From Swiss-Prot:
Transmembrane segments: none
Xref: InterPro entries: DALR_anticod-bd (IPR008909), Gly-tRNA-synth_bsu (IPR015944), Gly-tRNA-synth_heterodimer (IPR006194)
PROSITE patterns xrefs: AA_TRNA_LIGASE_II_GLYAB (PS50861)
Compartments it resides in: Cytoplasm
Single Gene Ontology BP annotation: glycyl-tRNA aminoacylation
UniProt record similarity statement: Belongs to the class-II aminoacyl-tRNA synthetase family.
Taxonomic path: Bacteria, Pseudomonadati, Pseudomonadota, Gammaproteobacteria, Alteromonadales
Molecular function as annotated in GO: arginine-tRNA ligase activity; ATP binding; glycine-tRNA ligase activity
Name the UniProt record assigns to this protein: Glycine--tRNA ligase beta subunit
UniProt EC number: 6.1.1.14
Keyword Magnesium: no
Keywords of the record: Aminoacyl-tRNA synthetase, ATP-binding, Cytoplasm, Ligase, Nucleotide-binding, Protein biosynthesis
Gene Ontology cellular component annotations, sorted alphabetically: cytosol
Record note on quaternary structure: Tetramer of two alpha and two beta subunits.
Amino acid sequence: MKFENLLIEVGTEELPPKSLRTLAESFLANFEEELQKAELSYESATWYAAPRRLALKVNALVTAQADKVVEKRGPAIAQAFDADGNPTKAAMGWARGNGITVEQAERLTTDKGEWLLHKAKVVGVETKSLVAEMAQRALDKLPIPKPMRWGSNKTQFIRPVHTVTMLMGDELIPGELLGIESARTIRGHRFMGVDTLELDHADNYLTALETQGKVMADYQARMAIIKADAQAAADAMGGIAEIDEDLLEEVTSLVEWPVVLTANFEEKFLDVPAEALVYTMKGDQKYFPVFDKAGTLLPHFIFVSNIESKDPAQIIAGNEKVVRPRLADAEFFFETDKKHSLESRLASLETVVFQQQLGTIKDRVERISALAAFIAQGIGADSEQAGRAGLLSKSDLMTNMVMEFTDLQGTMGMHYARLDGETEAVALALEEQYKPKFSGDSVPTQPISISVALAEKLDTLVGIFGIGQAPKGAADPFALRRAAIGILRICVENNLPLDLVDLVAKAQELHGANLSNADTAEQVLEFLMGRFRAWYQDQGISVDVILAVLARRPTSPADFDSRIKAVTHFRSLEQAAALAAANKRVSNILAKVEGDIASDIDSNLLQESAEQALASKLNELQPQLEPLFANADYQQALALLASLRESVDTFFEDVMVMADDEALKQNRLALLSKLRAQFLHAADISLLQ
C-alpha cells in the first residue's frame, strides 16, 4: 500500500473576511467526509486560508482504494429453481446482471434459509481519479448564502475563481473545479514577491508561497504572529493592546503578509468617552486600541499592514490621517450632545414609534420606569432611582453619537447621565439595561441596573406577545428569545425573590389597552419555561431532570434553579433509580383511582409491618422536611427523602395496595399519596430515567 500527500488550492478574488475561517474549515470537513465515503485512509489533514485562497492538505493519503469482495445475494433457492431443478427467470436475470451463470453462483446458508450468492471482487480505484469529484462535492456543500457568477461562466461560487491546483506528491491531478482546470500555477501576493509561481510538490506549498509569493497561507501561524507582534508593540509603548478574538480573526483574514505597525492620535481626543474612540478604531478601521495597566485608553493604536514597505512611516502617516477625521466626528458629536440633558430629550421620544400598536419610545420609557420601580420594591432596591433610570433609559437614542454609532446605545447614556449629575446607580443602569447582550455576557448585579434590565426586557416580551407577534420558527425580529434568556439569567444569577407571574402581570397591566391577545400572560410564561429548558440543556443538564422540575411549573426562576440543582444531585445518589421507579409506580396507581383520596392516614388500619414502617418513617421526616421546603432547600430535603428507599421497597414487596377491604385500600392509597406529595414538593421524580 502506497501513500502520498495531497494538496488542493482554490485561488480566488478577495474572500469575505468574516467567513474565511468558516469556509476553510467546512471545505476540509466536507472533503474528509468524502474520503471516508470513498474508504480512503489517511494520517492527518489540515486547512489553509488567506484572503485570495482556500486550501487543504491531506497527509499520508493512500494512493488507491483497497480491493474488496462484495457479496451480492440472489433469490432464495426455493425461487431460484423450479420443481425440475432448472433455474428460474429470476435466477437467470440475477446471474446475468452480475456477469455470471447460475451454475457459477455460490450458496449462502443461514438459519433463515438458503440463497444464491455471488462474491464479486471489486478492484480499488486510484485516488487521483477520485480527487476532483470529491473536491467539487466538498466545495458545493460550503455555507455560501449568496453565490455569484463571473464572466461567461455558469459556475457559481462565493467569489470568482482564477486558479485551481491539485497535486498528489509531485504529480498534477488532472480535473476541473468550479470551471477551472487544475494546473501547477498559484498566485503570490498582489504587491510583493512573484505574481505567479509553479508548484512542484504538495509538500512545498507553504514554503514556496512564503519565500517566492510573499503569502503566509497558514491562517493559524498568521494569527499568532499578529497577536504576538501587537502585544510586543503595545508593550514597547508602555501599554496593553486590546485584542478581542473577533477582530483578530477578521484582521487575520484581511492580510496575506502581516506587518504590525503602531501609530498615534492627538491627546485632545481622549476627552471623548473611550468607548466611542475604541468603537471607531475597531469597527471602522480594524485597529487595536492600546490601554495603560489601569485600563485607561492611550493616544496610540496598532494596525496590521498587508505589505512590507520600505517606508513604513508613510503607511503610519496615512493611517493616522484616515482615523483623525473619524475621531474628530466623535468629538463633535460628544460636544454637541453635552449641550442637552437626557431629561430634556424625553419630549423628542414622542416622535419615534417603538411599534405601531405599542406606542412611541416615550410611552415605552414610561412603562419601563413604572415596571422598574415595581421590581425594585420586590428586591429591596430604591424604587425612585429605578424609576428615574427607566425614564431616562432611551434618551440617548436621540443623541448624535448614538445615531451615528448605534452600538453605543446605553454606554453613551451612562456618560451623559454622569455629566447631567445623575446618581452613579442611575448612570450605570442606563448602560447595563441591555445586558446580557450575547451568550456568555455578564448580567447586571447592581439593584437599580437589575430593575431596569428586567423591566426593559419584560416590556418588549409582553408587548410583542400581546399583539400576537410571537417568534415563529427561526424568525425572531424583536430578539425575544435573547430577552427571555436574559430575564431568567438575571433572576437566577442574582438569586432574586421574584415570580414571573407577578412580573408578567405588572408588565401587562402597564401596556393597558395596547394588547389584543387575551392569552398574553399564559403564552409569555410558556415561552419563558421553554427558554428555561433550552438554557439548562445548553449547560448539559439532563432532559429528564428539566422535565421533572418543569412538571411542577415553578414560576420563580431562582426557585426553579434550586430545584434543578437539587434533582441533579438527587439523580447521582445510589437510591435515586429505585425511588424514581417507585414514584412512577405510585403515580400510575394513583392515576387509576376514581374519586378523592383521603388526606389523613388511619394508623389503626396499618396492618402490615411494612406499611407501618413506611408511615412511621414519613411521620419522622415530616418535621424535618417542612422547614427545608419552606426555605427552598430542596437538595437537603431530597437527600432526606432518599432515606425512604428501603421502606418503600419493602412496602411494595409485602403490601397489596389494592386490597379487597375498601378501608384498607383507601388507607394505603392515602399513604402513597402522602409519600408522592413529599417528593412533588421538589419535582416529579417519577420522570427521571
